[in-house]
């Protein structure tokens, strides 16, 4: 299991700041040691790192994992009994929860609170939402197969397809009657801070609750405005008035308006409503204020709700009031997860894509902590930093004595060290309602300026004037914005790709992420000619683009190719300012052409509205099938294919290998054997012919 992020994330330190996915070690003897709870030096981490896990979950500040022996491992924060082990002391490394030694745990879920499900469908609960240090057994009417939870919110689904809500804070589970009354079977569930998601066995998605994360925002306000207009304009007709009043009453049963403290209107959907835009959905996930749905037919993801921190992976919008496609045309997605403010996808090839992050507002210097890694990761989570004290404030007024980044050590920094700084996101509100006092930590800044010079640093004079100017430059708002643009877009975790680690499943918490490798290491697929063309064009754009008007021929590319080039540059984090502008221009030009022509043509090129539709298959028709096959083989640098005498490879074979129908190594072995046999047969034939010729010569000599 890999874990990275910030906080108490099981790597042996009281606080960690891990930017690259790092293996966790699991050791049973850790549960017996006392020093693992020490606030002092780091604990030496020993144990197994290749344990197989059947389920795991990253919570708000702690994590749970179930191994293949059905043992429950816990690590992280434990100030609110998150461990369920009759203790309030945290652990720097994973330890076993011995409360379940007599139970066979098969599934877990956690956030502030924790849940464990047994093989019999029994549910154990413990943590912040209840007044107990050890797990308590919940009373469900039916055996439960899955539970999801968020900040002070929980939802479950039984094996027979009944959804349950309202079982946090010592409350008893309540079935959602709407689905029972309408004979709708629920397959899986998810929840955020204020909303619920339900996935049916027919691939449809329902939602209820409050906010734009339900996906019904536009529908609600359109209906509300229409009802008000009808009530104002139909006073002359009693029948119409009655009808309108009935409609209004009906709406109130389904949707309810709530007045917030600021006087703003907010809606709350009482009865679950179907999201009509979504079909063929196979998985759902929810962040605090956003939602995700995986389309099993397209292998693509839809997202809606809040996008202030890039958790939807869509650049240029703060919110989406309805489900919209997160365009990733180069990959096929098989698994999704959404944390508080960031999300992660796993592709069919086992690649991990991560996006988003949390942003905490601070009037002081902002310290950024990466959720990913330097190459293909990003630096988005930001904590408040008190520059007069050697401590970091991370939510709920909790002060940690150990800093988690060299940025807050600048007062005692060695003069010989390089002044490394990090780009951070533009300063925005993150509505971090989960930590009720995240935005009220100003008590620690009253005396910040007492011992500082005009540059903002105390009189120790560690930084030179030049270094200070550079420091200030890297932390101005313009730099924040420029450095953060790519961070709102989905990105590969490059360290996993480089090490050929195939990911099977991922779970996003608040400040950290967990991921497990696949039990079956996939064979790297042969890259198609299309993929090589995409990479070739992308590299040329980055390496040879001197001005914004470079590459005039790119305007003739089909829009699907443009989208794939943009996706390649984005996922691999290769975009430059010019390439981003070029891609934005090409995409907007295509949309403008479509609008100008009123959809009366079939153009799929960027600036050629009258041209015919181009697809990759049509491009390749200009060449023979042998050309495509040879091009793929050559570009993949498969030496054995080009050097083996008599070896032939067809387009059908290439397609079969690419699609996984034929295992490449097996094909090579069989073909090589056939070629070798063929060569042996040829040698035998030649020897026989030579012998025959010799005999003929001898006979002729005798006759003479």
UniProtKB/Swiss-Prot annotation:
Regions annotated as coiled coil: 668-698
Bias (Acidic residues) ranges: 432-451
Pfam families referenced in this protein's UniProt entry, alphabetically: RCC1, RCC1_2
Origin superkingdom: Eukaryota
Mapped RCC1 repeat ranges: 1-48, 69-120, 298-348
Residue ranges of the region described as Disordered: 221-246, 412-458
Biased composition, class Basic and acidic residues, residue ranges: 412-431
Biased composition (Low complexity): 222-246
Keywords per UniProt: Coiled coil, Repeat
Signal sequence segment: none
Transmembrane annotation, as ranges: none
Name the record gives this protein: RCC1 domain-containing protein DDB_G0295713
Species whose genome carries this gene: Dictyostelium discoideum (Social amoeba)
């Amino acid at each position: 299991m890999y874990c990275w992020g910030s906080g108490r994330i099981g790597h042996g330190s009281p606080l960690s700041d891990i930017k690259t996915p790092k293996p966790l070690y699991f050791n049973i003897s850790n549960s017996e040691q006392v020093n693992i709870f020490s606030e002092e030096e780091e604990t030496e981490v020993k144990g197994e790192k290749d344990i197989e896990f059947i389920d795991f979950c990253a919570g708000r500040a702690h994590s749970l994992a179930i191994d293949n022996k059905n043992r429950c491992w816990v690590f992280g924060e434990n100030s609110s009994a998150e461990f369920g082990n009759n203790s309030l002391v945290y652990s720097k490394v994973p330890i076993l929860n011995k409360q379940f030694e007599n139970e066979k745990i098969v599934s877990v879920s956690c956030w502030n609170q924790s849940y464990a499900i047994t093989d019999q469908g029994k549910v154990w609960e413990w943590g912040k939402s209840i007044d107990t240090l050890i797990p308590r057994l919940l009373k469900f009417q039916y055996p439960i197969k899955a539970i999801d939870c968020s900040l002070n919110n929980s939802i479950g689904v039984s094996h027979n397809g009944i959804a349950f809500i309202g079982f946090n804070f010592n409350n008893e589970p309540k079935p959602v009657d709407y689905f029972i009354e309408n004979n709708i079977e629920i397959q899986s569930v998810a929840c955020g801070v204020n909303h619920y998601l339900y996935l049916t066995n027919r691939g449809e998605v329902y939602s209820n609750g409050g906010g734009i994360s339900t996906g019904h925002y536009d529908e609600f306000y359109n209906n509300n405005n229409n009802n008000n207009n009808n009530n104002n304009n139909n006073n002359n007709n009693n029948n119409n008035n009655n009808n309108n009043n009935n409609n209004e009453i009906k709406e109130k049963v389904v949707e309810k308006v709530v007045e917030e403290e600021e006087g703003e209107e907010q809606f709350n959907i009482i009865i679950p409503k179907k999201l009509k835009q979504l079909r063929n959905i196979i998985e759902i996930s929810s962040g605090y204020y956003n939602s995700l749905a995986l389309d099993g037919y397209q292998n693509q993801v839809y997202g809606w709700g809040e996008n202030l921190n890039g958790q939807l992976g869509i650049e240029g919008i703060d919110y989406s009031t309805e489900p919209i496609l997160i365009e990733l045309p180069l990959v096929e997605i098989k698994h999704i997860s959404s944390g508080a403010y960031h999300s992660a996808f796993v592709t069919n090839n086992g690649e991990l894509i991560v996006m988003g992050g949390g942003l905490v507002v601070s009037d002081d210097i902002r310290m950024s902590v990466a959720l990913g890694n330097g190459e293909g990761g990003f630096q988005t989570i930001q904590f408040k930093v008190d520059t007069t004290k050697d401590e970091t404030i991370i939510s709920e007024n909790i002060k940690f004595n150990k800093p988690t980044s060299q940025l807050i050590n600048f007062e005692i920094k060695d003069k010989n060290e390089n002044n490394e700084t990090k780009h951070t996101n533009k300063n925005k509100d993150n509505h971090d309602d989960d930590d009720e006092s995240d935005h009220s930590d100003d008590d620690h800044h009253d005396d910040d300026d007492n011992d500082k010079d005009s540059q903002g640093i105390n009189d120790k004079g560690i930084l030179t004037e030049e270094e200070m100017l550079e420091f200030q430059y890297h932390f101005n708002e313009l730099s924040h914005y420029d450095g953060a643009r790519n961070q709102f877009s989905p990105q590969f975790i490059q360290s996993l790709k480089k090490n050929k680690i195939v990911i099977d499943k991922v779970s996003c918490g608040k400040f950290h992420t967990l991921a497990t490798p696949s039990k079956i290491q996939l064979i790297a697929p042969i890259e198609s000619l299309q993929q090589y063309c995409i990479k070739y064009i992308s590299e040329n754009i980055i390496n040879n683009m001197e001005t914004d008007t470079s590459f005039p021929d790119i305007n003739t590319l089909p829009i699907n190719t443009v989208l794939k080039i943009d996706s390649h540059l984005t996922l691999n984090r290769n975009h430059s300012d010019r390439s981003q502008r070029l891609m934005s221009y090409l995409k907007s030009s295509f949309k403008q052409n479509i609008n100008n022509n009123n959809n009366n043509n079939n153009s799929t090129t960027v600036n050629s509205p009258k041209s015919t539709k181009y697809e990759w298959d049509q491009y390749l028709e200009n060449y023979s099938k042998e050309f495509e096959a040879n091009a793929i083989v050559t570009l993949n640098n498969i030496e054995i294919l080009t050097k083996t005498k008599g070896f032939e490879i067809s387009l059908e074979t290439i397609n079969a290998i690419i699609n996984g129908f034929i295992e490449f190594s097996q094909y090579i072995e069989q073909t090589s054997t056939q070629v070798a046999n063929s060569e042996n047969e040829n040698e035998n034939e030649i020897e026989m012919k030579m012998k025959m010729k010799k005999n003929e010569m001898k006979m002729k000599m005798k006759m003479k």
